Design a protein with these regions (language model features):
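Amphipathic alpha-helical coiled-coil scaffold segments and their short linker/junction regions
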Residues: 1-3, 53-61, 168-169, 173, ...
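A glycine-/polar-enriched beta->alpha junction
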Residues: 2-8, 15-30, 65-70, 78-100, ...
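Short segments within alpha-helical structural elements
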Residues: 16, 26, 178-205, 346-406
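Small/polar, glycine/serine/threonine/aspartate-rich low-complexity segments that form flexible
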Residues: 35-94, 210-224, 253, 266-303, ...
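Transmembrane beta-barrel architecture of outer-membrane proteins
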Residues: 73-75, 126, 171, 281-283, ...
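Periplasmic alpha-helical coiled-coil/stalk elements that build and connect Gram-negative outer-membrane
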Residues: 113, 117-230, 330-333, 337, ...
Length: 412
């Protein structure tokens, strides 16, 4: 499972969500920035009062001391902003909505990872069961092909003797062509499933890998009441939706707090030098930002988030209903497949008895060879159907585990 790209991606998503929580929390703490600027200039003052010399006898004139050939200065500054009360945060010490939103997103991702893991397990299980089932059906299908080839030869001999019509030969010849196509397909299915399973398991080479051709037996059906009342309450899909409800709640809180004034402490310092003389100033203060009028934009945003919160709460019940429906469907399909297996087993038993009788009659010279061949063809076909149904039953239990999100496990 550790080689699954899906699970690897989910792991990185969780790491990213953790960093987003830290980033959201850091935005609530003091923010300090600094700047350094170097400037050079030459020329004269452009203000009309800056260039007039009022001390001259005539009361006016150009002040030549305002001319500068070239000068350079350095400016160094720093700015500190500390949000005291903003978007529900009080000095960054409480559970602010902005942080809780990111935490809810991470919770949803964690439970989604559980669902992803079950999806990967189901995919591997499905390919394994299909592949082993296909490999186990190769020999019976090849046996059916050999029987049909013998049947075609016998039909042709019987036709030459005038005992059968050409239409009879044509029918069995078409069956032989279909059987050959089916034999090719089942071999390709087995090969494709084997290679696909290696890829899903993250294995590069198939030289030293041998697939066990024995399928496990089906488990006992789990207690439905326990699944409904105990395990269903801990289903990852429900917990994902609970995280979505919490996220919607925090979104609502965040937008609601934005209706209130915000308070921030700020301070700045500036140091200026022309590399001969220096100057500096320091500024500190408190800024209170009060929302006065925005034509109802923020209030309507709050209402939208409130209704979204209510929708997510209602959706929680819908998720529970969907899970209950999936569980009922899984039990129904398990029953239908089990009933089909029971029916096929009974029919296979009768066909096996018919084959033994036909073979015995053929040995005694009572029945023609085609009777035994047809009886064996019917038995092989029924055994193939039975093998398909048994593999399908295993898939039904794998689907049940997937539907339960891993709260009930057949495959660890």
């Amino acid at each position: 499972m550790g080689e699954s790209p899906k699970l690897e991606a989910s792991g990185f998503d969780l790491l990213a969500a953790g960093w987003e929580i830290r980033a959201a929390r850091a935005l609530l703490w003091p923010n300090l920035t600094g700047s350094a600027t170097g400037e050079g200039f030459s020329g004269e003052s452009t203000g009309k009062f800056g260039i007039v010399n009022t001390t001259s006898p005539s009361g006016g004139g150009v002040n030549t001391s305002r001319n500068v050939d070239f000068a350079g200065i350095g400016l160094f500054g720093g700015k500190l902003i500390y949000p005291v009360f903003k978007d529900g945060s009080i000095f960054g010490f409480n559970d602010a909505p902005a942080v809780e939103i990111k935490r809810a997103q991470k919770d949803a991702l964690e439970w989604t990872t559980h669902l992803t893991r079950e999806d990967v397990i189901y995919r591997v299980t499905e390919v394994f069961i299909d592949t082993v089932s296909a490999q186990n059906r190769v020999e019976p299908i090849d046996r059916r092909l050999a029987l049909l080839e013998r049947s075609v030869d016998i039909h042709k001999e019987e036709q030459q003797k005038g005992l059968l019509l050409p239409a009879d030969v044509e029918v069995v010849t078409k069956q032989l062509g279909s059987a050959r196509s089916l034999s090719t397909i089942i071999h390709q299915q087995a090969d494709a499933g084997y290679l696909g399973l290696l890829r899903l398991l993250g294995l590069q080479s198939s030289d030293h890998i041998r697939l066990n051709n024995t399928l496990p037996g089906p488990p006992s059906p789990p207690d439905a009441a326990q699944l409904f009342h105990t395990m269903l309450a801990r289903h990852p899909s429900l917990l994902v939706q609970l995280a979505n409800v919490n996220k919607a709640k925090q979104d609502y809180r965040l937008e609601n707090y934005r209706l209130y004034p915000s308070v921030a402490l700020h301070g700045s310092g500036l140091y200026v030098t022309d590399f001969d003389t220096d100057a500096h100033d320091l500024v500190g203060g408190v800024t209170v930002s009060i929302p006065i009028w925005d034509f109802g934009a923020q209030l309507n945003t709050v209402r939208a988030r409130r209704d979204t919160y209510a929708a997510e709460q209602a959706r929680l019940g819908a998720v529970g209903n969907d899970l209950a429906s999936d569980l009922v469907k899984a039990y129904r399909e398990i029953y239908e497949t089990s009933e089909s297996i029971l029916r096929h087993e009974g029919e296979a038993g009768k066909l096996d008895r018919d084959l033994r009788v036909a073979q015995s009659q053929q040995q005694q010279g009572i029945a023609p060879p085609l009777t035994a061949i047809d009886a064996e063809l019917a038995l092989v076909s029924k055994q193939e159907e039975l093998a398909i149904e048994r593999a399908r039953l295993l898939l039904r239990y794998a689907e049940l585990q997937k539907a339960m999100g891993g709260t009930w496990k057949w495959i660890p």
